[in-house]
């Protein structure tokens, strides 16, 4: 996979409990690189290859052919543009840009900015970047609850981590914790920082 032996992407393994997942999320709060979280559930019945800092875990290889990219109304969602474009170019993966079903225009504006970036890079490099836009059932506040049951054969979910934790996040866990806990595929996260690490050629 693209994160194997890739110093530009941090790889983390954890258990499936809320506490184990939150421990990883807390450890990565200041991470400038994208980071992939793989739980024991995925190691047991999915096909992924990778190394952690402490132990080496090897399973069967698989191809990264489809990436699910949910897009909400939050401004930091546009940070996904560079990362998903990079992943698509390096792996040839098809991007499913899943827009939150909001009444307002912010999610639509964010996804259009991501599409514009994809098209700009495609025109500049002459490479074909495969993508499609779909609309979720849920809005920006609930879209994360439908990702694990989304009817697409994706091998990775790309999320933006919460900028700050509110009361609900402290009590019940942030949205990214829910997605990781229920997902059957690895989840890649990027932290919304002004000095966000950019993957480049």
What are these regions (language model features)?
Residues 121-141:
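Active-site rim loops that border cofactor/substrate pockets in soluble metabolic enzymes
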Residues 12, 68, 94-96, 130, ...:
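A structural signal for isolated positions on well-ordered beta-strands in alpha/beta enzyme cores
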Residues 12-23, 136-144:
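Charged docking surfaces used in two-component/phosphorelay signaling
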Residues 21-66, 149-201:
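Gly/Ser-rich helix-loop-strand patches that form or flank binding pockets
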Residues 59-125, 181-183, 196-201:
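Short acidic/Ser/Thr-enriched loop-to-helix initiation segments
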Residues 7, 33, 93-94, 127, ...:
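Short glycine/serine/threonine/alanine-rich loop segments
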Residues 118-119, 137-151:
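A short, acidic, amphipathic alpha-helical segment used as a generic capping/interface helix at domain edges
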């Amino acid at each position: 996979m693209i994160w194997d032996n890739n110093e530009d992407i941090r790889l983390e393994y954890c258990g499936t409990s809320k506490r184990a997942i939150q421990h990883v999320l807390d450890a990565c709060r200041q991470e400038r690189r994208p980071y992939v979280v793989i739980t024991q559930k995925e190691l047991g019945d999915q096909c992924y290859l990778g190394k952690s800092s402490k132990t080496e875990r090897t399973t069967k290889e698989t191809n990264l052919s489809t990436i699910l990219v949910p897009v909400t109304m939050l401004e930091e969602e546009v940070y996904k543009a560079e990362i998903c474009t990079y992943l698509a170019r390096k792996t040839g993966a098809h991007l499913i840009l899943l827009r939150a079903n909001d009444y307002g225009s912010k999610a639509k504006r964010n996804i259009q900015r991501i599409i514009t970036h994809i098209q700009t890079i495609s025109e500049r490099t002459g490479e074909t970047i495969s993508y499609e836009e779909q609309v979720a059932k849920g809005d920006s506040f609930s879209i994360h609850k439908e990702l694990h049951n989304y009817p697409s054969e994706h091998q990775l979910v790309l999320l933006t981590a919460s900028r700050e934790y509110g009361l609900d996040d402290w009590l019940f866990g942030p949205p990214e914790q829910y997605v990781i806990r229920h997902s059957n595929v690895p989840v890649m996260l990027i932290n919304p920082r002004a000095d966000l690490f950019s993957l480049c050629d």
